Amino acid sequence: MVEYMVKKISGIIGLILLSIVMYIFMEVQVTIDSPNTDKPIIKEQEVNEVSEWITIPTYDGANEVTHPKILYFKDGFNGYKYWMVATPYENNDTYLENPSVVVSNDGTNFIEPKGIKNPISGYPSIKKNDTYYSDPFILYYKDHFELFYRKTGSIENGKYISNGYNYLYHMESINGIKWFSKKIILRNDSYERYMSPSVIKTRNLYKIWYTNYDCNMKYIESNDLKKFNKPLDVKIKNFDKGVWHSEIQYKGGKYYLIFMTRNNYLYYTESKNGINFDEPKLINTNLDELKGTYNYIYKTTFILRGNGIELYIPYKVNGRWKMYHKVMTLDNFYKELNN
């Protein structure tokens, strides 16, 4: 009797174990992508390709902006997935060129977030003169935003210089609405100029790229935004046209650079160390609908997300600034680069 019960229990346990094994086997058959690999299938995020003109609202009501920088939060931040800083620039009026923040949940329809007071930088001077702000860059690190932007003036302490006095400013925000701690981090240098900065922050180290008036890209770094190393030259393989405005991002062990030249061509390149970049590829910014118009582009911002890329390209078309929004799969983006 005891032997019979043992055999019966053993049989039941065996059936249970067999069922478990079969279930696991069936699950594995679903998740492996071939008999020769144990890597699970990872479904790539679907990319809905888009090419459209969008409106970026401005505090002056003209809705013309330039020099955008976009951030994307997958799960949203303070109610929004997209946070953009840009500068109004109707009629290329530098007095309006003050960093301002707008938000969106779809990357197409932007609004000013509730409670914000744009321009977040304020105005560069009480009265309109040759002093202006420009070239904003925004990042999010741990629990707060940081904003970098440039101030330029032709006259300081009664002394005039033709190319202007240049400073790099810094501000912070916890919620993206209220901004504080406005300070100068880089003072006037007659050669460097600090145009179009890009900043990557890691473990309290600020990595900063900018362009000088000779269209040379430079790299500096700092732990505290008080002391900086001597500028290093950024090199782009087989390229001697000079960099005008640019944006650098870091993702997956690579630095990604999209930059424009003074003759309004847009390029893409990559680097492993942020100093030596590969030979750049030309991004096609010619639009059939703009044939017969007088137009040119400006500093472009981008989002690398999953297997897609999102571009925001300012165009000035017949005297008016417009924003072009383009979403592509990375495969199609790279194919266009190689054509």
Predicted regions and their residues:
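Beta-rich carbohydrate-recognition and catalytic domains
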Residues: 25-131, 139-195, 200-244, 249-294, ...
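N-terminal Sec-pathway targeting helices
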Residues: 1-16
